[in-house]
């Protein structure tokens, strides 16, 4: 057992607390969406922007978080992240309209974007390199508990209090965390290169405008010509960034990353793959409540097997990849996830509710194997000089693709659910059935990309749990 000095242990607890807050918030909201819709006078089929606004903001802000921490100091930025996250939570709870809630989620997302990467950077600075793995294991555990606790806790709060409490519980916790950060966390700074502000703005504008163009006609009533202009503007911003990065050695993300074939394939596959899988955590609790009439608490409990399956698969995924190779694992898990998603809908509509936890457990296992394989494939062949930049770009793409996935899911629900639908009605079942069929196709398509992954040339190392010190 690795022993840390008392002051270091307290600092690690602060980082772990930030990981927990951020991971809890990513899952606790989904269960509450139907109740939020009823309270705000909105259709539950149009509540996806509550999720998209948060995840997209995280994607936009991630590239700036590490630079800000180096320039201004890890304590100052981590403190600011907790304060912004807590203020965003307060404004979410006070929101009286969907637009107010979306804006509050943007503020919350700014704080959430800085918590995890700055937390990792803090750990690197406060512990010796030899203890880094043990320290990261220590701080990451609460982050794994958050997704497990979030759906059930969200269901309890919604059912026995109100949806406002899923945000209000962050306030006292955030105040304590901010005070502890300010008093106990050292403020490490280092000399940094100039921040690529033009590149950051081009990427931010491109991501935000393209996501808005996907859903603007349904949620905001934007005309088709305006949407076409937005899509063209977003694409132009991304193309301008590529031109900027080609001419600028200090660009936010170097184009030299794409000289590594597995990085290019892995990044493209991760983007396409997470669009499909990003729909599932949003759609599943909404379907359980609106489509099947489950209570918020019951729907939250049903999400736990999916998280347990995901956590359990992480223990054996390296051995599976070593045995079968990246290409076979990624193609099989991609097609398997599409089939399992269809199995979930079939079992639900047949009324075999007792099988749903087993199907969701299987879904979590398959999804986790695919996620872990995509991540390691993308980064494993990068040279050390580009590893940090590649990891940051992958993190941004992961968040962006999930926001696009939720946006597309909301767009599909709006397209198939034009008429008023009731809870657990035949019309509602048809809306979700057609949506799930489209989702299964979207989930399966990245198999075409993963089929191009080259044969593996080296084995992945398996860490022995008997020899690892914590």
Curated annotation (Swiss-Prot):
Residues 33-48, 98-101, 159-164, 218-224, 284-285, 363-395, 452-470 are cytoplasmic. Its main location: membrane. Keywords: Cell inner membrane, Cell membrane, Membrane, Transmembrane, Transmembrane helix, Transport. PROSITE patterns: MFS. It is found in: Cell inner membrane. It comes from the Bacteria. GO terms for molecular function: transmembrane transporter activity. GO terms for cellular component: plasma membrane. The chain crosses the membrane at residues 12-32, 49-69, 77-97, 102-124, 138-158, 165-185, 197-217, 225-245, 263-283, 286-306, 342-362, 396-416, 431-451. InterPro entries: MFS, MFS_dom, MFS_trans_sf, Multi-R_MdtD. CDD domains: MFS_LmrB_MDR_like. Belongs to the major facilitator superfamily. TCR/Tet family. This is Putative multidrug resistance protein MdtD.
């Amino acid at each position: 057992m690795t022993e840390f000095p008392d002051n270091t242990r307290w600092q690690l607890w602060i980082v772990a607390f930030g990981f927990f807050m951020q991971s809890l918030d990513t899952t606790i909201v989904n269960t509450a969406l139907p109740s939020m819709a009823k309270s705000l006078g909105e259709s539950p089929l149009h509540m996806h922007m509550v999720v998209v606004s948060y995840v997209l903001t995280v994607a936009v802000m991630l590239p700036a978080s590490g630079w800000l921490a180096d320039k201004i100091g890890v304590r100052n930025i981590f403190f600011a992240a907790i304060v912004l996250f807590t203020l965003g939570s307060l404004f979410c709870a006070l929101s009286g309209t969907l637009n107010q809630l979306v804006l509050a989620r943007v503020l919350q997302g700014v704080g959430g974007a800085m918590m995890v990467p700055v937390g990792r950077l803090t750990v690197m600075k406060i512990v010796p390199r030899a203890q880094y793995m043990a320290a990261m294991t220590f701080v990451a555990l609460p982050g794994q508990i958050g997704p497990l606790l979030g759906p059930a806790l969200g269901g309890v709060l919604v059912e026995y209090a109100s949806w406002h409490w899923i945000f209000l519980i962050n306030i006292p916790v955030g105040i304590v965390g901010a005070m502890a950060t300010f008093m106990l966390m050292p403020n490490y700074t280092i000399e940094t290169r100039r921040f690529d502000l033009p590149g950051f703005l081009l990427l931010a504008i491109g991501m935000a405008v393209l996501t808005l163009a996907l859903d603007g006609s349904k949620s905001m009533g934007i005309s088709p010509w305006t949407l076409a202009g937005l899509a063209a503007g977003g694409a132009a911003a991304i193309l301008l960034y590529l031109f900027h990065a080609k001419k600028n050695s200090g660009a936010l993300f170097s184009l030299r990353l794409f000289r590594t074939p597995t990085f290019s394939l892995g990044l493209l596959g991760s983007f396409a793959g997470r669009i499909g899988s990003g729909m599932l955590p949003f759609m599943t609790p909404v379907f359980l409540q609106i489509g099947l009439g489950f209570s918020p608490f019951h729907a939250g409990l049903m999400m736990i097997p999916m998280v347990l399956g995901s956590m359990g698969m992480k223990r054996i995924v390296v051995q599976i990849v070593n045995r079968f190779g990246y290409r076979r694992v990624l193609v099989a898990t991609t097609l398997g996830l599409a089939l399992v998603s269809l199995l979930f809908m079939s079992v639900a509509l047949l009324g075999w509710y007792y099988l749903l936890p087993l199907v969701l457990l299987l879904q979590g296992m398959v999804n986790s194997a695919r996620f872990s394989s995509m991540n390691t494939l993308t980064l494993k062949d990068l040279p050390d000089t580009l590893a940090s930049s590649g990891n940051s770009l992958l993190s941004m793409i992961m968040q962006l693709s999930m926001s696009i996935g939720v946006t597309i899911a909301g767009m599909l629900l709006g397209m198939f659910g034009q008429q008023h639908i009731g809870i657990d009605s035949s019309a509602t079942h048809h809306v979700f059935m057609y949506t799930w069929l489209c989702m299964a196709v979207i989930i399966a398509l990245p198999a075409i990309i993963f089929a191009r992954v080259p044969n593996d040339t080296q084995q992945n190392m398996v860490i022995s749990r008997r020899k690892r010190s914590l």
